[in-house]
Amino acid sequence: MNTSLEQSGCYSNRETLLRCSDARRELELAIGGVLRAEQQIKDNLREVKAQIHSCISRHLECLRSREVWLNEQVDLIYQLKEETLQQQAQQLYWLMGQFNCLIHQLEYTQNKDLANQVSVCLERLGSLALKPEDSTVLLFEADTSALRQTITTFGSLKTIQIPEHLMAHASSSSIGPFLEKRGYIQVPEQKSASSGTAVSLSEWLLVSKPAIGLQAPYVPSTNPQDWLIPKQTSENSQTSARACSFFSDAWGNLKGLENWLLNSHQQEIAGKPSSSKCNSHCSTSSFSPEAEKAEDVELLDQDELDLSDWLVTPQEPCELEKPVDGSWETSEKFKLLFQVFREPYNVSDWLVKPDSCTNCQGNQPRGVEIENLGNLKCLNDHLEAKKSVSVPGATISDGWLAQNHQDTWKVEEVCKANEPCTSFAECVCDDNCEKEAMYKWLLKKGGKDKNGMPMEPKSEPEKHRESLTLWLCPSRNELTEQAKAPKAMAPARIADSFHVIKNSSLSEWLMGPTCKGGPKDVPNTEERAGKEMLQSSMATSWCPFNTADWVLPGKKVGSLSQFPSGEDKWLLRKKAQEAFLNSPLQEERNFRPDCYGLPAVCDLFACMQLKVDKEKWLYRTPLQM
């Protein structure tokens, strides 16, 4: 008994717990629905306010347009009345002039022939209207009470109860169109063009309406076909074709989208049903409801195809499909149609052209305010800048040179205007300051003054060349000093030098092998003694044979032994080694790399102690005797 009681108690507790859980779940769902409804009301509130503002603004604009139209009508009526009264006044003035002439003739003359003229004028006077032919009263009548009533009753707010299963899935922006398609909302007919939403409030309220029988509550359909978009019909296809007719007339028959795909994809899609419309994929600007329905049908037709059919794979090169049915004219037509979108253009053509100054030649003079001088630009500078930008053959190096260009002078130092210009392109002077500064700089570089006359001081390029030469070869300094000295050398001295060379024996020109390739067992003392003896012999017999006398004549240099020979000897050995290693003689006999060539020739030139430029000594033309 106790176990049965315990089981019944547990069962009752479990049932109570389930009921409480269900109740809590229902409350949570209800709270969620209330919160969603509150959010939807907020969204709908903003949308309704925007619609009210737009509608009122448009009708206010209509009232303003009506006001303008009425004013124009008043002006037109005034012009018509004025013309009528002017014509009547002209006739009266003319007739009054006739009577003035007759009165003057009757007073001063006794002519009886005027009776006919008087009778004619009196007849004309009887036929004319002496009162204004047109009325002078112009009134404005308006039914202000009706307008006020229309304004006060303009617009209304309506609400509708939406089913719960639609509230959970429909958003605030899509509730209206969705319910309209399903038949929940009856679209009210527009009463007039000025009041599109002016319908009574009773149509939106849930009140009992007189009917034959009670309307059955709404029951959702269980047939899936009722929830799908209906298939395209012939009527819809004709409607969409009419909507795209103007596009076809302008662009030609572009055919379906499948004609624009690759050949491989078209072969894959060949076995599948394609779109039955020719112009279904054309983008039109039609805002009619028929076009919207056609777009819905297009979406359905596109969904029937597989997604892989629309993807482009990199298996084949992307080439446009050949014209259908081999029609070459159709492809040419497409090229001509889309050629407009491929034409090149220059961005500078769209920019505002700056004004040119009136001082440039070939420009028509025109008035310029002094306040706008800062906005003017010289025509020549503008054309040069435009040419440099629009030249098609400009290379990357030209751009690099333009970026790294450094002006030789500053604008502030050269500009002659009262207020210095920011750049030479904005110069407002008669003569461009940049050109004048360039002219002076070129004259200065050429060693001339501002009048074009040569200047005595050394020009800057010569000074720069001299400093560069001194930095590259310090040994040339002595040669330069010799050149600066007074040039005095007797012809007899040159003749004596040639006489000594002619009478000398050939054995004096040869020397023993003392280079690296020679025997290494010679003591250092003997080598040093041989060099001293050679130098002493050169000091006695070879003194007239001075290399400086052959290159740049100058004063006689003292003993040749005072100059170091390490630099010249090393250079000569290095040149001889490079020349010998590059010659085919080294490959044939396979000499060692440390062999510098003929030892006697190397030591001969090394002992001569050449203290001048070797290139000048080799290439200088001989002296004319």
From Swiss-Prot:
<dbReference type="GO" id="GO:0005739">
    <property type="term" value="C:mitochondrion"/>
</dbReference>
<dbReference type="Pfam" id="PF12489">
    <property type="entry name" value="ARA70"/>
</dbReference>
<dbReference type="GO" id="GO:0005694">
    <property type="term" value="C:chromosome"/>
</dbReference>
<comment type="function">
    <text>Cargo receptor for the autophagic turnover of the iron-binding ferritin complex, playing a central role in iron homeostasis. Acts as an adapter for delivery of ferritin to lysosomes and autophagic degradation of ferritin, a process named ferritinophagy. Targets the iron-binding ferritin complex to autolysosomes following starvation or iron depletion. Ensures efficient erythropoiesis, possibly by regulating hemin-induced erythroid differentiation.</text>
</comment>
<dbReference type="GO" id="GO:0006622">
    <property type="term" value="P:protein targeting to lysosome"/>
</dbReference>
<keyword id="KW-0968">Cytoplasmic vesicle</keyword>
<keyword id="KW-0675">Receptor</keyword>
<dbReference type="InterPro" id="IPR039947">
    <property type="entry name" value="NCoA-4"/>
</dbReference>
<keyword id="KW-0158">Chromosome</keyword>
<protein>
    <recommendedName>
        <fullName>Nuclear receptor coactivator 4</fullName>
    </recommendedName>
</protein>
<feature type="region of interest" description="Interaction with ferritin heavy chain FTH1">
    <location>
        <begin position="394"/>
        <end position="533"/>
    </location>
</feature>
<dbReference type="GO" id="GO:0003713">
    <property type="term" value="F:transcription coactivator activity"/>
</dbReference>
<keyword id="KW-0832">Ubl conjugation</keyword>
<comment type="subunit">
    <text>Interacts with the ferritin complex, an oligomeric structure composed of varying combinations of ferritin heavy chains and ferritin light chains. Interacts (via C-terminus) with ferritin heavy chain FTH1 (via 'Arg-23'); thereby targeting the iron-binding ferritin complex to autolysosomes following starvation or iron depletion. Interacts with ferritin light chain FTL. Interacts (via C-terminus) with ATG8-like proteins GABARAP and GABARAPL1; thereby mediating localization to autophagosomes and ferritinophagy. Interacts with MAP1LC3C/LC3C and GABARAPL2.</text>
</comment>
<keyword id="KW-0458">Lysosome</keyword>
<dbReference type="GO" id="GO:0005776">
    <property type="term" value="C:autophagosome"/>
</dbReference>
<keyword id="KW-0539">Nucleus</keyword>
<dbReference type="GO" id="GO:0044754">
    <property type="term" value="C:autolysosome"/>
</dbReference>
<dbReference type="GO" id="GO:0005654">
    <property type="term" value="C:nucleoplasm"/>
</dbReference>
<dbReference type="GO" id="GO:0009725">
    <property type="term" value="P:response to hormone"/>
</dbReference>
<dbReference type="GO" id="GO:0006879">
    <property type="term" value="P:intracellular iron ion homeostasis"/>
</dbReference>
<dbReference type="GO" id="GO:0031410">
    <property type="term" value="C:cytoplasmic vesicle"/>
</dbReference>
<dbReference type="InterPro" id="IPR022174">
    <property type="entry name" value="NCOA4_N"/>
</dbReference>
